[in-house]
């Protein structure tokens, strides 16, 4: 049997951290077993779908390096890959369930359903159980009501059964059929509900293993019921634990203190491979506690048995550490492929070399680029106050000896060292006066590099009065 996994988002929002991790674990599992990873779009709820939701899902998965073998647009025997293109299939199968006695029409209006709920609450039943009254009506009455076209189709749950599965993450899980209400499989608008459509899709696409969030645990017995009604083989399920913030609370899209969507991290310029690596460790560990993996080694190492049963903490500092580590080891030319700087390639290369070790993301390069691309016209009051208290001798010597004709980093650096030896000073006493006079700030990269990057025209103008 070929391993086939899937990630099946709804285009009701952009790719969330939790969804990305679900996609990644399904992808890693499939690739570890030389299987296929499928991207399917669950777009049956038109009222909630947003513009570019599907596009965001696909583009950000590709940015992460999670490449589907099949996706919307693929021409295979398993498609189509959007639920909105399979409505006839769902409706046909729902009719089959009715014929087999596993489903039935229900004609309740909202008021009648609310009355049922109130009556059950009064009896101490707080988890709604549908009363199956419509199973008792005559065929004549049923046909009459069907003409009005106001009905849903409900699945008839076998109350005598226990619905059990051996969860790939959590072990044996069981639900009593008596605790599950007869649930809607086809809504009044003719569209399938999630729990019905997802089973049909997984069967049609021959999905063998499903890793998903723990919020789907309560959906699983309903889905198993559908598989059993059709006598279809049930895939293996694994339910992942939640991802939490620093306070131990589940990540919420409403929490503005942390970016929740992959697009945010992409736009900030985080290293995609670093994010891929970091995401894999949110709920999975390698046997030897290794943390750095390239794409291929992570696929090779992935073992679902090492998926955590405890919640995973989204540590932004750890992500920053990963991204910084990846960027620091990249070839300079690869970094430059991701940046748009000046027209001077020699300057660009020196600039990247200067800030490579300190940059967490590509946005950090741009932030530093602004300092040199749009240099200050004068020293601000705070810096001026610091500068006035310093000995100006290092500045005067530097201004008189700097070689503008042969603008060279090594010569600038050697001159600074020479001044230190001549005045018998080091550290802040040597560097701070020159730094403030040349860069108009008291911090930054190595001084000689900052001076070279600012360029001889700007430095000559700033040092003119100190000659």
Swiss-Prot record:
Name this protein carries in UniProt: Glutamate--tRNA ligase
A Pfam family matched in the record: tRNA-synt_1c
Enzyme Commission (EC) number: 6.1.1.17
UniProt superkingdom: Bacteria
Presence of keyword ATP-binding: yes
GO biological process, one term: glutamyl-tRNA aminoacylation
Record has Zinc-finger as a keyword: no
Role, per record: Catalyzes the attachment of glutamate to tRNA(Glu) in a two-step reaction: glutamate is first activated by ATP to form Glu-AMP and then transferred to the acceptor end of tRNA(Glu).
Alphabetic keyword roster: Aminoacyl-tRNA synthetase, ATP-binding, Cytoplasm, Ligase, Nucleotide-binding, Protein biosynthesis
Catalysed transformations (reactions): tRNA(Glu) + L-glutamate + ATP = L-glutamyl-tRNA(Glu) + AMP + diphosphate
Motif 'KMSKS' region: positions: 250-254
